[in-house]
A protein has these predicted regions:
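Glycine-rich dinucleotide-binding loop and its adjacent helix/turn
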Residues: 2, 30-96
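A Rossmann-like FAD-binding core segment of flavoenzymes
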Residues: 1-32, 54-67, 95-175
Length: 175
């Protein structure tokens, strides 16, 4: 908001004036999905999508938004994941007037790491959650046209305490 650390005030000055200084840079290195078809066009990392949307909302020129690549308007959107970043993506896609928004998550609602409030808000906004599902491969010629999805069953809890996802044999379906 028109403030740059080091230019408008030094980090030392901020520390002197405040009880705490929180630096929230977030995670900017996407996790790669290593499945067949992950090299197809129109598959984007979450932060690229969210950053483009935020910049556009601030009035910036964003080439990949302006050319339609990162604009969800009138598109069928699938978001993979169950954390707060995934919830930000599904809700942003809804606000951009996507035709449909689905969220694939490999566990059930009770074992999801994201905020339950965010999930409830996304559901109220029309996001369809496809619980107990995991992408198997992306299908298409040059760009993604469908996603082949495996159904999941939950096993025993893992180190995190959440039940471990196990792929159900011969259960795949397409979205």
């Amino acid at each position: 908001l028109n403030f740059e650390v080091g230019k408008d005030a030094s980090l030392s000055e901020l520390k002197e004036k405040h009880d705490a200084v929180l630096i929230s840079t977030g995670v900017y290195k996407p996790r790669e999905i290593e499945i067949e078809g992950s090299d197809l066009n129109n598959i984007y990392p979450a932060m690229e999508f969210l950053t483009a949307s935020n910049k556009k909302g601030l009035g910036d020129k964003v080439e990949n938004f302006d050319n339609g690549s990162l604009d969800a308007k009138n598109k069928d959107v699938i978001v993979i994941g169950g954390g707060d970043t995934a919830m930000d993506c599904v809700r942003t896609a809804v606000r951009q007037k996507a035709k449909s928004v689905k969220c694939l998550y490999r566990r059930d609602k009770e074992n999801m790491p994201g905020s339950s409030r965010e999930v409830a808000n996304a559901e109220e906004e029309g996001v369809e959650f496809v619980w107990l599902s995991s992408p198997k491969k992306f299908l298409g010629k040059n760009k993604i046209e469908k996603v082949s999805v495996d159904k999941i069953k939950l096993g025993e809890p893992d180190e995190s305490g959440r039940r471990k996802p196990i792929i159900q044999e011969n259960s795949d379906f397409e979205l």
